[in-house]
């Protein structure tokens, strides 16, 4: 599996024939100034955890260029179709559901957060419940992108049901759990081989580094992968 980080919670995942963008915050992202065209190249699927602008700003452009399938909750799918996304290429779901994405499946799981999109004039459009995404690949390990969330005890059920081995974990505090709590979640509820921290260092209000997360996982046997922004790593 190849993984590229574009800052914040935006990742490109490549395994088998699947080329996936998760939460493609590629427009207006202070951490990523490389544009959306490169990350969109060859993309087969766009997956969204929730509707905040720092997770979907760039999704419409990527979908328009790539012709990729959109996998998100029903409200986000309908909202983006209303903004110009191709309604024949949506694959909606909701918490607890699993959708066949062609070559892999995606299960929608809960996250403790909120989900809306701020439009001009201060209007916030409700975009369904926030979530995490569990990606099952037939010839690769299962990956869990937690979305934006705090720790919650039902993470134990996510592990029991799906046994993810790769975790993408928000650690920036204020809007998600912080690094120490995120490390506790990984240790207590999961048996990850590798974790990739995200949602840090993007804005002054959130933690600038993953130091607390790394410290919390010392001695756990879990590998903390820290790709540079724009770097592709193999997991």
Curated annotation (Swiss-Prot):
GO terms for molecular function: hydrolase activity. Keywords: Hydrolase. CDD domains: metallo-hydrolase-like_MBL-fold. Belongs to the UPF0173 family. PANTHER family: UPF0173 METAL-DEPENDENT HYDROLASE MJ1163, UPF0173 METAL-DEPENDENT HYDROLASE MJ1163-RELATED. NCBIfam families: PRK00685.1. This is UPF0173 metal-dependent hydrolase mll0680. It comes from Mesorhizobium japonicum (strain LMG 29417 / CECT 9101 / MAFF 303099) (Mesorhizobium loti (strain MAFF 303099)). The lineage of its organism: Bacteria, Pseudomonadati, Pseudomonadota, Alphaproteobacteria, Hyphomicrobiales.
């Amino acid at each position: 599996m190849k993984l590229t980080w574009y800052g914040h919670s935006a990742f490109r995942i490549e395994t088998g024939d699947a080329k996936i963008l998760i939460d493609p915050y590629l427009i207006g992202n202070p951490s990523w100034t490389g544009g959306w065209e490169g990350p969109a190249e060859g993309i087969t699927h766009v997956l969204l955890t929730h509707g905040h602008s720092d997770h979907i700003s760039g999704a419409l452009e990527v979908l328009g260029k790539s012709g990729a399938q959109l996998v998100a909750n029903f409200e986000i799918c309908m909202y983006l179709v209303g903004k110009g996304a191709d309604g024949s290429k949506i694959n909606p779901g909701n918490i607890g559901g699993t959708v066949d994405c062609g070559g892999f499946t995606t299960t929608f799981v809960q996250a403790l957060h909120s989900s809306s999109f701020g439009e001009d004039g201060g209007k916030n459009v409700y975009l369904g419940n926030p979530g995490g995404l569990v990606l099952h690949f037939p010839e690769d390990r299962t990956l869990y992108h937690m979305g934006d969330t705090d720790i919650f005890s039902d993470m134990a059920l996510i592990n029991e049901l799906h046994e993810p081995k790769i975790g993408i974990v928000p650690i920036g505090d204020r809007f998600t759990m912080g690094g120490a709590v995120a490390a506790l979640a990984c240790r207590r509820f999961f048996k990850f081989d590798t974790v990739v921290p995200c949602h840090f260092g993007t804005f002054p209000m959130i933690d600038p580094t993953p130091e607390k997360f790394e410290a919390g996982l010392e001695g756990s046997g879990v590998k903390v992968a820290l790709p540079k922004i724009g770097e592709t790593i193999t997991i």
